[in-house]
Amino acid sequence: MRDRGFTLVELLVAMGIVTILATVAVPSYRHAMHRAQRLDARLALQRIQYLQERHYAQYLRYAARLGDNRDSPDSLAMPDRSEAGSYELSLLAGEDGQTFTATAQARVGSRQIDDLSCRQLAIDDAGLQRSADAAGNWSSADPQRCWG
């Protein structure tokens, strides 16, 4: 007559299978989460681009900074954080106000700080989309890697 329960070997085999599945699933889950959170940055940057074009139509120059003053020729009425709070937003305008670059950088303390391949996203007045990895290496060669 056989005792009810599991043998030690059966438990070790089951634990091994669970471990193998976890080593595959956890990185895939993190990658999917990082990719989903990038949408927060992309939407914020596209909103900045839209607001900059409206600002340019009104003042014939791009805004130089983000802020709360809606009627200032130097400020764009938008907060310096993305909606979900995962990214810090910044705006750099050319001295003549005819160019700009908007950047979203993963905020320290957010999950996105662990996004090693796409830690920063940027868009400029011409619509050029760029991204930077954790080391700060910028690239526009394959924008779909981080923007897609």
Q: Which residues make up each language-model segment?
A:
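Periplasmic/extracellular, small/polar-rich flexible segments of pilin-like filament-forming proteins
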Residues: 57-148
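Short, charged low-complexity linear motifs
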Residues: 9-19, 38-47, 133
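Membrane-proximal N-terminal amphipathic helix
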Residues: 33-61
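Residues at secondary-structure transition points
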Residues: 3, 35-39, 43, 95, ...
